[in-house]
A protein has these predicted regions:
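Walker A (P-loop) ATP-phosphate-binding motif of ABC ATPase nucleotide-binding domains
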Residues: 2
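Hydrophobic anchor at the beta1->P-loop junction of P-loop NTPases
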Residues: 5
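The conserved Walker
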Residues: 9
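Conserved lysine of the Walker
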Residues: 13
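Conserved substrate/cofactor phosphate-moiety recognition/catalytic segment
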Residues: 18, 22-60
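Glycine-rich phosphate-binding loop used to anchor ATP phosphates in small-molecule kinases
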Residues: 52-93, 102
Length: 161
């Protein structure tokens, strides 16, 4: 199984991903690490990414996910996956891909982003992320107002892990 932790920037994908990976003994991949330098530069300057910017990045993540699914191994991937188009692209590996949507309100996430240091994604881009977001119909939805330990426990319970 490959768990894709999705949601807007600041929703806790990295924190939850590391916690899940530690508890399950699965590898964790930070989707941000797969962005080409041009994407990172744009976001660092407060410029939202277009679909054309995102597609090569999504293809790199899709290829990683396919490797795990095809070899019958487990992994956790953090990826915003804001649009249904993006999720379909990532899910091309088949039914062993499970999306977990880390859902929270704008104010909570903005507060978290403003507290972050050394991250290229600035709080000023949060509005564009929410505008781009198409809430998923096929995902485990998780309320991020709970502490990370509770979120991880909920995900494990719901997925039978």
């Amino acid at each position: 199984m490959v768990i894709v932790l999705m949601g807007v920037s600041g929703s806790g994908k990295t924190t939850i991903g590391h916690c899940l990976a530690e508890q399950l003994g699965w590898p964790f991949y930070e989707g941000d690490d797969f962005h080409p330098p041009a994407n990172v530069a744009k976001m660092s300057q407060g410029i939202p990414l277009s679909d054309d910017d995102r597609l090569p990045w999504l293809d790199r993540l899709r290829d990683l996910i396919c490797e795990y699914v095809e070899s019958d191994k487990n992994a956790i991937v953090a990826c915003s996956a804001l649009k249904e188009l993006y999720r379909r692209r990532l899910a091309q590996a088949g039914d062993r891909v499970c999306f977990v949507y880390l859902q929270g309100d704008y104010d909570l996430i903005e507060e978290r982003m403003e507290a972050r240091q050394n991250h290229f994604m600035k709080a000023g881009l949060l509005e564009s992320q929410f505008q781009t977001l198409e809430e998923p119909e096929k995902a485990l939805v998780v309320d991020i107002s709970e502490p990370p330990e509770a979120i991880v426990g909920f995900i494990r319970d719901q997925l039978g892990l």
